[in-house]
Every structure is written in C-alpha cells, then in structure tokens.
C-alpha cells in the first residue's frame, strides 16, 4: 500500500498537521489496513451531504468510544478543492485520524485518473496490498453503514487473510453459499489498471469529469 504514496508526503488532520514524510512512516500508518481514498471537495453539494455519513462511519469504526479496538481502517482525503483555503476549511471539522495529500501535490489529480473517478463524492476501497475492492464505497457506506466494513474485510480475507492470525486459518468451517456472490461483487482489480466498474455512472451533477 505504501508504494501508492512512494516519495509523497501524507499529512495527519490534527492540530499540528504532522507530516508522514518517509516511506516507513507511511507504511506503519497504512499497513494491514483497508484504505479508503475519499475524493471530494468542499464546494460540492453532494460531498457536503455525504460527509456527515462518512464521518459517522469512520468514527464508529475507529473511535474507542464506540469500539473496544479500532478497526483496521485508514482514510486518505484526495482533495479536489479549487484552492488550499477551501481544502483547509473542508478538513477543519473532519476526524483527526484522517490523512490527506498536500494541496500542491499533483497526485491528487493523478489518483482521480488512475481510479477512473467520474463524479464526486467517491470512495475507492483498497486492500492492504493496494488492490481495489470496490469503487462504489460511497454508495455502500450510505446504504449499509458500518456493516459494509465487515463485507470489505471478509472480501480481503478471501485472498490474503490479512486480518487473521495463523491459528485462525486452521480447521475453518466451509463458507456460506453466498461467498461466490461476494467474490464476484468485490472482484479484485489491480490498482494500476484503473479500469471502470460495470454500471459506473458519469455525467451527473457533482461529476468530476473535468477535474482530472
């Protein structure tokens, strides 16, 4: 996962805006986690409507007030704001555990093209190794809430068991008949391919077609 941000700086959305400026720091922050790439902009009405839902989703999975142990989840805000001031204003009330790219980093645009983002808001969910689980994260978060995290986690386990201890792999019971459907829905695509999901919409209000 760290290779996606190789040579880049990620910033923590805390009061000090601590920088993760080495590959080791980025790796420690992202390793063995599902990573949400959140493409949004403060001036986008659809983003403003979605953000409270996303914040609640993230906090309920990572804040010890709600859970005994924070979920293996990280979020990187990939700003599509027009100015750095708009980006700062948008992040002001966002969770402090969020990460974001510096405004001057062109990777903000490159990631939009790489993952075929066509409208805002968009949430691309990545496995710990950088493979794509789904590009429809925003829709699933709105429909399913925190329950979709368990779906994503299970889909990641299908391939690499990143969320299980070695002893958990022994004597496992057969999975349900619906597993094949989940595998199909959450088919793994190499992040470098940047292909489109079937049925992915475009050209709607809030579209990001001109941003990338």
Curated annotation (Swiss-Prot):
GO terms of molecular function: receptor ligand activity
Chief localization: other
GO cellular component terms, semicolon-separated: photoreceptor outer segment
Positions of region (Disordered): 191-212
Record bears the keyword Coiled coil: no
Keywords: Cell projection
Gene3D superfamilies membership: Glutaredoxin
Subcellular location: Cell projection, Cilium, Photoreceptor outer segment
Known role: Plays an important role in retinal cone photoreceptor survival. In association with glucose transporter SLC16A1/GLUT1 and BSG, promotes retinal cone survival by enhancing aerobic glycolysis and accelerating the entry of glucose into photoreceptors. May play a role in cone cell viability, slowing down cone degeneration, does not seem to play a role in degenerating rods.
Subunit structure: Interacts with isoform 1 of BSG.
UniProt record similarity statement: Belongs to the nucleoredoxin family.
Full protein name: Nucleoredoxin-like protein 1
Encoding gene, per UniProt annotation: NXNL1
């Amino acid at each position: 996962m760290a290779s996606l941000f190789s040579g880049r700086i990620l910033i923590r959305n805390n009061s000090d805006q601590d920088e993760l400026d080495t590959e080791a720091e980025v790796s420690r922050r992202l390793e063995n986690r599902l990573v949400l790439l959140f493409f949004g902009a403060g001036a986008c009405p659809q983003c403003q409507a979605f953000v409270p839902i996303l914040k609640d989703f993230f906090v309920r999975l990572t804040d010890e007030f709600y859970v005994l142990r924070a979920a293996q989840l990280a979020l990187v805000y990939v700003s599509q704001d027009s100015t750095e001031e708009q980006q700062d204003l948008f992040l002001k009330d966002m969770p402090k555990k969020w990460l974001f790219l510096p405004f001057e980093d062109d990777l903000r645009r490159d990631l939009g093209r790489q993952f075929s983002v066509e409208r805002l808001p968009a949430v691309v969910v990545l496995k710990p190794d950088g493979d794509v689980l789904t590009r429809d994260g925003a829709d699933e978060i709105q429909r399913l809430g925190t329950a979709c995290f368990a779906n994503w986690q299970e889909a990641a386990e299908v391939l690499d068991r990143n969320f299980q201890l070695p002893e958990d792999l022994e004597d496992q019971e057969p999975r349900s008949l619906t597993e094949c459907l989940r595998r199909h829905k959450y088919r793994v695509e190499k992040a470098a391919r940047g292909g489109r999901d079937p049925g992915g919409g475009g050209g709607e209000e809030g579209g990001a077609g001109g941003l990338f």
